[in-house]
């Protein structure tokens, strides 16, 4: 999942990994994983804005290796607060639709929402 998430963040073509991801995750689990990953980055960005520094021990409960910490920081700051808002809104609406609409073709719906997510990240 991490390499898939990185491809989404780096605005690379993630279609090749999407099939593998859809085979291993159900649609709601994938939405929740994306939400959790973006939320972790959002927490890092907000913490840095409020405190002027990043303390991974306080944020995540552990101190990641320096390279991982640097990667998380750069990912967190690559997005604007407004983009985070749009991402969370999209993911929550997607999860709601998946749970409440029994006539939905889930795989196609998820792909269309991932394309919307990619569009949000490119802005």
Annotate each predicted stretch with a short phrase:
Residues 1-10, 14-123:
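C-terminal alpha-helical interaction modules of replication/initiation AAA+ assemblies
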